[in-house]
C-alpha cells in the first residue's frame, strides 16, 4: 500500500466507507475524495478492495487507501482498521456505514428474464419487487435473515463502537448510516416491533436488540407471517428499521456528533440487478451531502434521498 505523508494527512479530514469496493460505496469514496477528504475504502475482499482503489487512483483520486474490513469480525479486521487509522491519520472525522446485504436469495436467471420481459428502462420495472410472481423467485431462510441482521444492523454497531474513540478526536465527527425507505416504520407490520421502534423516547439499544431477537426466533420457528412480519423482505425491512432506531439512540447518546441515516433511493446496483430510479453516482450524492453537512448541521434524523423524512 503506498505511503502518504503523515503531516499532510493529519491536516485533511479522514473518512471510512464500509462496502466501498462497488456500487454506491465506490461512488461515495469517489465523491468524498473529490471533496478533498482522505478516504479509507474498506471491504471484506482484499483483491476487490485493492482493485477499487487502483481504479480510483487511475482517475486522479489519489487520496484513497484500502484497508480490509469484515463488519462481522470485530476482533480481527475491525481492530486492525482502528490501529491503522490511529497510526496513519491520528483521528477519524467521517464514518459512512454503507455495507449491507438483501437478506434473501434470488433465482437470478428467471429474475433477469422477468426484468427483460418488462423492459429494463420501463417505469414498471422498479415495481418488480412488489409483484407476487417476482417474490416467488426469492427465498428467505433463517440463515439468510441472520446474516442480514448481522451485517446490516450488528455490523454497523460493531464498526461504530470500535471507531468511536477515533471519531471523538475529531473537531466535527460525523456518522452516516446508509439505510432504506423500506425500513420506515410504516412497513414494520409486527405490532410489538412497531411499538418498540416507534417509541423514540424509550428507545435503547437493548430494546432494539429485542426486536432483532424476536424476528430471528420467528424465522427459526417459521412464524413470520403468523406473527405479522412483512410477508416479503422481513429481514431487510427489520434490519433497516433497527438501523434507523440505532441512529436515533446514538445521536442522543453522543450529542457532539452528527449522526444521521439516509436512504439513497432505489439505485441501479448489482444487488438490485440494475433496477432503480438512480445511478450509483446519484445515490451516493444523497449520502455525501449529509456527510458534508456544515458543522452546525442536524443530528438524529432520517433522510429519504435529499428530503427530511419521518422515521
UniProtKB/Swiss-Prot annotation:
Annotated consequence of substituting residue 48 to E: 30-fold decrease in affinity towards NADPH. 1.5-fold increase in affinity towards NADH
Effect of residue 104 to A: Strong decrease in substrate affinity and catalytic efficiency. Strongly reduced substrate inhibition. Almost 200-fold decrease in substrate affinity and 112-fold decrease in catalytic efficiency but no substrate inhibition
Binding site for substrate: 180
Chain residues that bind NADP(+): 17-40
Gene3D superfamilies given in the database record: NAD(P)-binding Rossmann-like Domain
Keywords, comma-separated and alphabetical: Alkaloid metabolism, NAD, NADP, Oxidoreductase
Gene Ontology cellular-component terms listed: membrane
Thermal activity profile: Optimum temperature is 40 degrees Celsius.
Name the UniProt record assigns to this protein: Salutaridine reductase
Chain's gene name: SALR
